[in-house]
Design a protein with these regions (language model features):
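H/E-rich (His + Asp/Glu) clusters that bind or coordinate divalent metals
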Residues: 164, 171-190, 202-321
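Active-site gating/metal-coordination segments in enzymes
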Residues: 58-192, 320
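Acidic-and-aromatic substrate-binding clefts and catalytic sites of carbohydrate-active enzymes
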Residues: 33-38, 64-65, 102-108, 131-138, ...
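Short, basic, glycine/proline-bearing loop/turn elements
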Residues: 25-31, 128-129, 239, 243-246
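Mid-to-C-terminal alpha-helical segments outside catalytic/metal-binding sites
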Residues: 1-9, 14-54, 81-89, 110-114, ...
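Hydrophobic faces of well-ordered beta-strands that scaffold small-molecule active sites
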Residues: 7-11, 55-57, 95-98, 124-126, ...
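Short glycine-enriched loops at secondary-structure junctions
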Residues: 11-13, 102, 158-162, 276-279
């Protein structure tokens, strides 16, 4: 991409406290997917190799839902304090999305204030559902109302759907269930009226929106038919809602996927993401080269995906540009 100046909005990190919490819960994988090693030093080495200027770090699946309620607030605070410390040490190389102790709504509201007002993190990470409660559920209305008031940037990462059992098919959840769960979340966010009610949230979905680009018209028809919002949706409103989301291009580095995504949304809604360290390091450079060489993207469009769109979302990074 131009200038090899990528802003990577989909990158993950771990803290000692988070690793300890995973072990205490008996979790040694992400729904069958091995948990990789990570250090800031090794991440920066790879960023330099790949031409990534800044990574916005977040906790990946399984998020925090596995933690007992009594421990979740402290775990979220520890993770966010660690993220803020990394940013202080590497202000131009690192950004961060704050973890919230959901489904504890009061604790989450408190952590939003601390993370954005005190720690000055760049946004919030949420998950497609928390213990089976999908984003868009009325139980999370207070969270989205506050994020809307703040015009916050929110990155939504998928988790395994309720009832997932890897033994049924033999594949870890990230292989296919993650993109399906992103699609479910998008559908519920629109159908519940949350997108309509909270237009100021800047919400990024992972992996090119999952299966949404391919299923958009089918999903749209059924939101119009079964959507719970009042007044009812029109087909035009639903298609506009699809364009409201931002989409990272992680895992859409092949022609039919990117063509479908670009048919659904304009170029100013696309953001670069690597999914490091879960994505194999050997797969990241070819994915960068694919986006860089797409014939249907001109130089300005490539620059927008590389960093221009992200700089509009993250003023702290723009100040360092």
């Amino acid at each position: 991409m131009p200038g090899q100046d990528l802003i990577d909005i989909h990158a993950h990190f771990f803290t000692p406290e988070y690793h300890q919490a995973l072990r205490a819960a008996g979790l040694d994988s992400v729904d069958g997917f091995p948990i990789p090693g990570w250090s800031m030093e090794s991440a920066i080495e790879l960023m330099d190799l790949w031409g990534i200027r800044t990574q916005l770090l977040s906790i990946s699946a399984p998020g925090i839902e596995f933690a007992p309620r009594s421990a979740a607030r402290k775990l979220a605070r520890d993770v966010n304090e660690n993220n803020a410390a990394l940013i202080r040490r590497h202000p131009t190389r690192v950004g961060g999305f704050a973890l919230l102790p959901l489904p504890d709504v009061d604790g989450a509201l408190e952590e939003i204030a601390h993370a954005l007002d005190v720690l000055k993190l760049d946004g919030i990470v949420l998950f497609t559902h928390i213990n089976g409660i999908y984003l868009g559920d009325k139980r999370f209305d207070a969270i989205f109302d506050e994020l809307n008031r703040r015009k916050a940037v929110v990155f939504v990462h998928p988790v395994a759907p309720p009832g997932f059992d890897m033994n049924r098919l033999g594949f870890p959840a990230p292989c296919v269930e993650f993109p399906f769960d992103t699609t479910r979340m998008i559908m519920n966010m629109i159908a519940s009226g949350t997108v309509r009610r909270c237009p100021n949230v800047r919400l990024i979905v992972a992996h090119g929106g999952g299966t949404l680009p391919f299923l958009a018209h089918r999903i749209g028809r059924n939101i119009v038919r079964f959507g719970k919002a009042n007044p009812p949706f029109t087909p035009e409103e639903v298609m506009a809602a699809f364009k409201w989301f931002y989409y990272d291009v992680t895992a859409v580095s092949h022609q039919h996927a990117i063509d479908s995504l670009l048919t659904l949304v304009p170029i100013d809604r696309l953001l670069y993401g690597s999914d490091h360290p879960f994505m194999l390091p050997t797969l990241i450079p070819p994915a960068i080269d694919f986006i860089k060489s797409l014939p249907r993207l001109d130089a300005s469009a490539r620059q927008a995906v590389a960093n221009g769109n992200a700089l509009k979302l993250f003023p702290r990074l723009a100040a360092h540009a």
